[in-house]
Amino acid sequence: MNQPELPESVTFCGRRFSRSELELMRQIADQFAGLGRTEIARTLCELLEWKRPSGGLKNYECRQLLERLAEQGWLRLPEVRPLGPRGPRRVRLSAASAEQPELTGTAGQYEPLRLIVVAGASADSRLWMELIERHHYLGYRVPVGAQLRYLVRSQRTGERVLACLQWTSAAWKMAARDRWIGWTHEQRARSLPYIVNNSRFLILPWVRIQGLASKILAHCARQLPEDWQRRYGYRPLLLETLVDGQRFAGTCYRAANWIPLGQTQGRGRMDRYHQADGSARKLVFVYPLCRHVQQRLREAQPPCFSEAEADTDWA
């Protein structure tokens, strides 16, 4: 069966792929079909030198691109072959994440807060995963794409953790956000990396400190741009989050001056098929990190990823 002619170029995750590179993808997908999708993606990442600033291959992003090209009929991929037990990775729980004595008061009493970047297979990383798995209603999931995690501590409480956060790549499509920005499909494909999604935010259940959540969000808005640039080589322009409106009202985001944009349409986070999948509708909030953010997102060029040394990417 003949495959349709490839486009002149495709832009994905901030990188433009020429027709010759797309031809290479088609050729490798045909030649190594017996290896499976993951190995095809890894091979292409090596050939195209598609890497993170830390040097790690962008395997997930490459596989996602291949699957989108396959959906358009531009190349063929082997069927997915499940390996081992399916489902989320299990996190072994220990006493480190067990309930602790209650902390009360106001956020001002716990200043200065410390937002500690969690990287690699450190003790902080294991603690972060445990706390999220045990105490967050969504539990722990391996994030995809770019990500940054924080543990929040206070000088007053020493090593005791007050909160955990995770920031990840933005949702591919979000009607309320995309209308607010006013960008085209091509502009979104080019500039989406400049948006960072707050995919996990956990105030630990024994921490009952008034105003703490909004205070942490304000600290993040100041610190995250530099931390993200240090790891990925560019500064984000906009923060976003999705709040389960059946559980939460988004009060802390409102208190931290995030902008409410409405609700999602009940589609999955990486919606590719323009249809509802049964996902609960979420409240959409955004927080600009610069002036004229909508215009800047519409006009931005794909980010230039730094070759500087960065923390090991754990995702």
Predicted features and spans:
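Basic, amphipathic alpha-helix used for nucleic-acid engagement in HTH/winged-helix/SANT-Myb modules
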Residues: M1-L22
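Short, cationic low-complexity segments
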Residues: P303-A315
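N-terminal accessory alpha/beta regions
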Residues: Q64-Q72
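A short, conserved structural fragment
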Residues: E71-E79, L261
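Short, Lys/Arg-rich nucleic-acid/phosphate-binding segment
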Residues: V80-L83, Q265-G266
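Acyl-donor binding region in acyl/amide transferases
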Residues: T11, L22-R26, Q31, L35, ...
